[in-house]
């Protein structure tokens, strides 16, 4: 599930990791990874977290982070829109099967949109290319990066077929926003 993989960072830095999640997600994490939430934790190599339930926009430094509910099949995930200096810098929408109107409105005009796109054909919990490109058009970002691509997607074939300002993300990609 990936969550437990963060324990290495606790070992390296000898401190807790802040974890931001919706109340429903936090409940699921507590049920699945009970030992992480139990105090005291006697093993240094256990994942140690500082849980923070997200129920409203919050601040990290000068950045305001606005949580946005997104459908992921029958579940709800959380996307984020990052604001700084009155500008929408980044909208991060992954693990979603569509982008509802409230999320489109929250992200509209963001400088960068990072958007879930699994493959060409429909999928019950992720957007396909057609759905993602429609969501991108509705949001009207400066640049869109499509993420969460499956093994069926050929970067060489797809990248050239995308509309202007839309790109396939890749491992190691660095995105600059608000510069």
Predicted regions, residues:
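Binuclear metal-dependent hydrolase catalytic cores
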Residues: 1-93, 156-179
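Cap/insert and terminal regions of metallo-dependent hydrolase folds
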Residues: 97-178
């Amino acid at each position: 599930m990936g969550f437990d993989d963060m324990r290495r960072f606790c070992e390296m830095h000898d401190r807790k990791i802040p974890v931001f999640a919706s109340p429903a997600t936090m409940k699921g994490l507590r049920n699945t990874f009970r030992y992480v939430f139990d105090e005291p934790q006697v093993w240094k190599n256990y994942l140690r977290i500082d849980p923070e339930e997200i129920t409203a926009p919050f601040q990290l430094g000068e950045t305001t982070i606005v949580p946005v509910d997104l459908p992921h099949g029958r579940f709800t995930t959380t996307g984020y829109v990052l604001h700084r200096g009155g500008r929408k810098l980044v909208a991060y929408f992954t693990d979603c099967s569509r982008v509802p109107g409230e999320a489109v409105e929250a992200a509209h005009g963001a400088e960068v949109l990072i958007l879930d796109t699994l493959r060409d054909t429909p999928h019950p919990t992720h957007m396909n290319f057609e759905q993602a490109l429609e969501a991108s058009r509705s949001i009207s970002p400066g640049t869109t990066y499509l993420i969460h691509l499956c093994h069926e997607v050929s970067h060489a074939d797809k990248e050239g077929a995308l509309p202007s300002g839309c790109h396939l993300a890749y491992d190691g990609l660095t995105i600059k926003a608000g510069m």
